[in-house]
Design a protein with these regions (language model features):
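Short, amphipathic alpha-helical segments
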Residues: 74-82, 102-106, 110, 114, ...
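Conserved hydrolase catalytic core segment
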Residues: 94-137
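A general structural signal for short secondary-structure junctions and capping/turn motifs
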Residues: 32-35, 115, 162-166
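Conserved acidic catalytic loop of the alpha/beta-hydrolase fold
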Residues: 63-74, 78-98
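Short, flexible loop/turn elements at secondary-structure junctions
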Residues: 6-8, 46-49, 103, 127-130, ...
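Alpha/beta-hydrolase-fold enzymes
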Residues: 120, 125-191
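Catalytic micro-motifs at enzyme active sites that drive phosphoryl/nucleotidyl and oxygen chemistry
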Residues: 29-33, 87, 109-111
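N-terminal cap/lid subdomain of alpha/beta-hydrolase-fold enzymes
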Residues: 1-61
Length: 191
């Protein structure tokens, strides 16, 4: 089985005690659980372009000694899945019982069904969707970054001023999941 992660987490989503945006999947992993380690070989690799370890815009370009920054090649969903496929080939995995993932990991699972339908028996796309939530498309997000005074044409590394837009983008994303309503119901205003 392949477990795919979202933008704001990594393979640590399967590690007990790790707190990630999509919530820990550690309770789902182990003998007799949905991700049954007695029945399946479970792989959860880091996503291409992720800030949690694989190559991305903040990776050092060996030709310049600086981060790739805006010169980093564009990555598509198909690219991410192709890299996962290549990893599985190197591990000797020829068939997957399932590909499952939350959030953007769910999009990856769906892409697996499109790119390698004969290799995958089932997909699980959880807390995901077929389209971006309204106002959170890749282009609108890129434009919000480009309009920020600290953007500097994409050369913003080490500039703490980008934190405010990243924080607001995360809040907006969580609101689109309905978490604001959930929190209001669980933690009513004491006033």
């Amino acid at each position: 089985m392949l477990v795919t992660h979202g933008y704001t987490s990594g393979p640590s989503m399967l590690v007990p005690g790790h707190h990630v945006a999509e919530s820990s999947w550690a309770p789902l992993l182990g003998p007799g659980r949905p991700l049954d380690t007695d029945r399946f070989f479970i792989v959860c690799s880091n996503m291409l372009g992720s800030s949690f370890g694989t190559t991305g815009p903040n990776t050092t370009n060996p030709a310049t000694g600086r981060p790739w920054g805006p010169g980093f090649p564009a990555i598509t969903l198909e690219d991410i899945v192709a890299v996962q496929h290549r990893l599985l080939q190197q591990l000797g995995v020829r068939h997957l019982r399932a590909v499952v993932g939350p959030s953007y990991g769910g999009w990856q699972a769906l892409q697996w069904a499109l790119s390698f339908p004969d290799m995958v028996d089932a997909v699980g796309s959880l807390v995901s969707g077929l389209t971006h939530p309204k106002g959170l498309s890749a282009e609108s997000t890129r434009q919000r970054f480009a309009d920020h005074p600290a953007w500097n044409g994409g050369w913003h590394y080490g500039d703490a001023r980008m934190t405010d837009i990243l924080t607001e983008l995360r809040r907006q994303t969580l609101r689109s999941y309905g978490l604001e309503t959930l929190f209001e119901a669980r933690m009513p205003d004491p006033a």
